[in-house]
């Protein structure tokens, strides 16, 4: 061992030998209290972290649910139509597909009305009175 280590060990051994029961009890109380408070604090922090994680998961789940409840026309157009069922989900899907089909028909009619060859609507704005 080095000279510094020997000096350090000798110093601590001398201090421990000179301690009486009162000092040892005090040391045990301090160390025991530290360990007890540390365990309690770590448990409480773990509870807070778990509660925060549960709250975050609830918010994420609610946000996902609200996004799922919003009708997305693109999703309905690409949805699979091969499966047929009798439940509420199938009825909603069929209703959504019917609405999309009706909207597509109305838009096609509007486009065709503007392209009617017998219509003078496209040249009316060019005519001067």
Swiss-Prot record:
Region (Disordered) residue spans: 53-92, 106-129
A Pfam family that the UniProt record links to this protein: PGA2
Bias type Acidic residues, positions: 117-129
Location relative to the cell: Endoplasmic reticulum membrane; Nucleus membrane
Signal peptide range: none
Record PTM Phosphoserine, positions in chain: 119
BP terms from Gene Ontology: protein transport
Keywords from the named record: Acetylation, Coiled coil, Endoplasmic reticulum, Membrane, Nucleus, Phosphoprotein, Protein transport, Transmembrane, Transmembrane helix, Transport
Keyword Nucleus among record annotations: yes
Keyword Coiled coil: yes
Positions of modified residues (N-acetylserine): 2
Segments forming a coiled coil: 43-116
Superkingdom of source: Eukaryota
Membrane topology type: Single-pass membrane protein
Main localization, broad class: endoplasmic reticulum
Residues that span the membrane, as ranges: 23-42
PANTHER family from the UniProt entry: PROCESSING OF GAS1 AND ALP PROTEIN 2 (PTHR28199:SF1)
Role this protein plays: Involved in the processing and trafficking of GAS1 and PHO8 glycosylated proteins.
Protein name, as recorded: Processing of GAS1 and ALP protein 2
Species per Swiss-Prot/TrEMBL record: Saccharomyces cerevisiae (strain ATCC 204508 / S288c)
Upper lineage: Eukaryota, Fungi, Dikarya, Ascomycota, Saccharomycotina
